[in-house]
Amino acid sequence: MSEPVAMTLLEDWCRGMGMDIHRSLLVTGIPEYCSHAEIEETLNGVLLPLGTYRVLNKIFLRQENVKAALVEVSEGVNLSSIPREFPGRGGVWRVVCRDPTQDDDFLKNLNEFLDGEGRTWEDMVRLLKLNPNPPLPNSNQPPPNWAEALGLLLGAVVQVIFYMDAAIRSRDEEARAEEAAEAELMEAWASTARKRVKKEPGLGVEVGSAFKMEDRNYWKNTEDHGDPPKPLVRRPGGKIRSRRRKQKKNLKQEPICWRKSQGSNYNSNYNKVNLEAGEAAQSSEIPESVKSNKKPFVKQEETVWKKKRVWRDPSDLPRSALPAADSPGNLEDSDQDGGPENPAKKKAMTWASNKIPVPTRKKKKMVSLGTLSYVLLDAEATKNKTAILKKGLGARRAVSVPHDAPASTSRPQKTKLGAFPRVSKDSRKL
């Protein structure tokens, strides 16, 4: 093995085991079969007279097929006095170590370099970080890491500020949540109170007093929850006025339907005719504003078989018409031929035409009046007024049928004593 390779191996081995190179030796040329005791026995004759020593480790070199041993000597042993070669078992053993003169030359060159750069050995040790435990600084001198200390202090202050800010924000959020919940409760309570006041008007005083007790500035802070409810205050006499207005609004004139009495008295029918005449007079006095709201009454022409008939009390007729009403045969003749009863017939028709017809329910009633009988008059006077024909089959039939029917179509009605005259089916449809 060459000397530079052996020196490199010694430096690497000392650095790996943490040994001082100035006290270490590398012994090469030891045979492979040589034991540890035999190595120490051979070294005792060379190193023991110079001082104590210790064999630290051994290694096998494959290229040379020999062993190498790392030996540490005690302090005070001069390495220059150790021989570089000595005889041993299996051949010549060689010794490799650091020459002290080499170190002196290196140190001389290093000092010259540091002086030229303006550096010292302490600067080199600090830069190379060769001393893991630096000496404590003097208390009188300021600390060299004052910037780091200031940064730590500022970091602690910033953390405290952030913590306080977070606490203040959490408190504000809790207060806002409580205010929002209170506002929602008040709004719900106000809505329920309004509903109860609408149902029970007597509760307006309690609600008004409750709203008076509330703070006026309270609703200004709840802009996000909509408009505040208006205070409900009950005024004296408000309930009476509301009822009066309600009565005025609901006041409607409903038509009174007069129903025919089902009795058999003659006076009841007579009173009914008078009441109808009174209603016609009242309806004639209705103002135009009311008439405008009602639908116009339209008269329709009817056929001969469905003419309008008017029942008339015989007492209201003139005396000239009474003898003609004794029998139904005379009645039919007077209606068809237009005999001497035409003036009375015209009078009755004009009285019926002056009446404003009131929509009444037509019923078939049989009233027994003893020997008296009603006179069925034809209301032909109403045909003189303008009539509006309806479109349809009924209107066409009404136009096609002539107004004057032949006398053969009418049949004399048979009457029984003490009973009503028999009325044809066409006359009952009234």
From Swiss-Prot:
Cystine residue pairs: none
- Tell me the domain of life: Eukaryota
Q: Where is the composition biased (Basic residues)?
A: 232-250
InterPro entries recorded for this chain? Answer: PNM8A_C, PNMA, PNMA_N
Q: Please list the residue ranges that the record marks as compositionally biased, kind Polar residues.
A: 261-270
Region ranges (Disordered):
219-270, 313-364, 392-430
Compositionally biased tracts (Basic and acidic residues): 219-228
Family recorded in the similarity comment? Belongs to the PNMA family.
Q: What is this protein called?
A: Paraneoplastic antigen-like protein 8A
The organism named in the record is Mus musculus
The record's gene field reads Pnma8a
